[in-house]
Amino acid sequence: TAHQAGIQVIEITGDCYETALAVAKEAGIYNDGDLAIKDEDFQKMSDDEVKEIIHRLRVISRCSPNTKLRLVTLAQEIGKSVAMTGDGVNDSPALKQADVGFGMQDGSDVAKEAADIVLTDNNFASIVKGVELGRTFLHNIMMFLEFQLPINFVLLIFCAIYPVVAANAEFLAPVQI
């Protein structure tokens, strides 16, 4: 799940508060102790207040395009990497502002154009799977380098010292290159 991967999911929707909260609970986004607010309450908050609550925020209902853009911008200001999903014209400013914008295949052309990546299966779980694959790939590269660099360093030192020890040896023989 996104939570297990260390990804904080915030549902920003045009749905009414009750519907948004029910969807968030069913999807595992919202738990006890988390924060769900209406757009009108979000608009009344200062930027500093939003930055203080953003780690607990899980749902914003009746959301406007300006709220989506503001939330993305404020999350970036506190150092979060932000991915945004959207399928409507109203999502395009936030999709462009986000570090990674995910459009939906069945979404509007404007949203797909604003997005960095288009999810052809329209499935949020594809993002989590992509993050998992990316982290696995990075881990494998790091493990390869952790193994390969010391070996290559030792061989380089050996190639530099051997000609000094063996007086008649070439510095780098064709076989060594």
Language-model features and meaning:
Residues 11, 82-83, 87:
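Hydrophobic "anchor" residues on beta-strands that sit immediately upstream
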